[in-house]
Amino acid sequence: MSFEEAKKRFQIFFTTAGDVAKGAAGAVRRKLGYVAFDSWAYYVFLINKDYLNNLLFSRLKNFRRIPLFISRTLSAALSTLFSYYFKMHFPPKPVGDFRVFGKNDAPMQEIEDLWEQNKTYYGITVDRKSRYLKWRINQNPYFDYVYVLNYKENRLVGYAIISLNHNNAFLIEDILAEKSDMSIFDEIISYLIWYAKDAGVAAVSCGTLEGNAILKSIFARNKFVDVEAFRSRITRKERSKEFHVFFSPEIKCKQ
């Protein structure tokens, strides 16, 4: 299906600016009518300081105004400082009812029911029905996802979907709590941090849009650090809006 054909069927399209291709893909998409909408945020809770050292260095070394040896030294120093910060804010081990499932064993109907009962709390977002999750998560051949489910009195009240990336960090793909309850989110995040520690995983992380108010609040409460915001402060370079949206002319919106 071509883009012109798709425009007749759908009203909104989402894509990225193509940062890997040095922005070339983003330039093409803007010519098609996409609008730069938001920047990416990358939240991290560090368990092993070497992970953050490598992460900071990988971002700073691409900034030409900072010499490579300074980027390396600065990354090492900052990761050491941050390791003390994360130790100070390491959460108590949660005592709730948590159950971990592989992607082929998760109770999909329970998850869909939780979503249907609470989707009004989450605004415009993907519809987390079991059919979508099976396609997006369970049938994804590139990642081995794990479902972490939180129960209270044998009733599902929240979940997180995570995968282990190539840098030995848990990446949160999705997280949801009944009534968007922050106390439930806090318990889930605490469990993920301890789950990572016990499994020898270096960090818990989540990549999302900077403007996602719910996730920003969740990760701020739980003392995660937005690496992209930190890099922006060090380099004094404003974050580019790499998330692009195409709106059908039928939709009235303010740009």
Please annotate each region the language model reported.
Residues 66, 73-74, 78, 107-114, ...:
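Alpha-helical structural motif
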Residues 1-4, 8-9, 178-187:
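Conserved glycine-rich acetyl-CoA-binding loop
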Residues 13-87, 136, 146, 152, ...:
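Active-site/acyl-donor-binding loops of N-acyltransferases
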Residues 85-101:
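Long, low-complexity segments enriched in small/aliphatic residues
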Residues 19, 96-178:
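A conserved beta-strand-loop-helix scaffold within acyl/acetyltransferase catalytic domains
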Residues 7-9, 142, 198:
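Alpha-helix termination/capping residues and helix-transition junctions
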Residues 5-8, 58, 83, 109, ...:
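Polar/charged alpha-helical tracts
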Residues 23, 109, 113, 131, ...:
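Generic alpha-helical secondary structure signal
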